Amino acid sequence: MENEEKNKIKSQELTQRIGKNGDRILRENLDDIGLANEINHEVIDLINRLRVYGVDIKKVFSECGRDSTLKTEIDRNQAMNIVSRFFYKFGIDVSKLLEEGKYNNESGQTVYLSFNKEVKRNETTSPTFVGEDVHAYAKETGTLTDVYSLVHEISHTLYVQNQFGEARMILGEVIPQCMERMLDSYLVELAERKENDVDIGTLKKDITKRKISTAIDRFRLTSRIAKGEYKFASEKAELSRYMLAQIYATQLMESDKSVRKQRIFEFIEALKSNDIQKANDAFDMKIGKEHTKERARYVSNSIWNLQKDVLTFQGNEVSKEKRDETTRTISEEENELEI
């Protein structure tokens, strides 16, 4: 009991120290509040623009909310098979974890997975010290959501082998969101090869819905930073993690397909070694507050992608004239970004 109490105190002290230093990095290096204000302003402009184009914003938010259900039905075995094959494309074998709910990673760390209908929320524990067990939880719904949930939570287990640090604190949501976006095209490939008995039209709409749902969630959290809706620095840091994940994932998907996988591996290694600069270099990110032009471009790309996805999702309900007008506007914005 005495050792447990000592370990608990050491864990709390380390977490507090990392938390203070991480908050300093967010404030002084990244200016997370300034970035949140910039994003929030662009989101408000986007909402107004979409209304002009005839998009029913309330309907989109309702259909693509955080708890929205995807229509494509996927049973438990199908979900695990898809996820196993997806990670195998990266040279990562998660078959034992999926089949047995437990495996030891290359560091000897034990990773547990609970994937069932009793799980209340999707989450993965973040160990403080080397060697501590990792527990991932994914709720089973019988839909395509399960595939995304499993990919997201298992991705969290790929970089937590070492001691908790500032890189994991600030950038810990990046890899799971990037893997979700890599999953999008993989699912379409499977459907086109008819390897899964799914309606490809419904699948594509579900994929777009998932992308919108994630973006809406991230931008809502960003809005909380901009509005000062947090009590503690640790709470703001948690919000910033999700804000940055949206930006970094967008940046990865802007890169050439041939380099994405390698960039993900380099980013994972940077998180393991607690090297924020190395992580930024892996994605060719210049996110520091001194890089105003680059930051503006990252924000614009994120907003542009959400606009494109919303218009795709609501395409049949927006008049052709409005869609043409929107396409012209998007093209103009894209050209401005390249200047």
Enumerate the language-model features and the residues they cover.
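Short, glycine/acidic-rich hinge or "gate" loops at secondary-structure transitions
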Residues: G54-F61, K96-Y103, G165-E173, E189-L203, ...
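Active-site His/Glu-centered metal-binding helix of metallohydrolases
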Residues: L150, I154-L158, I175
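C-terminal, non-catalytic "cap/extension" segments appended to globular domains
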Residues: R17-N37, K59, G228-I339
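Contiguous, non-catalytic segments that form substrate-binding/exosite surfaces or channel walls
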Residues: E2-V134, Q314-T326, I330
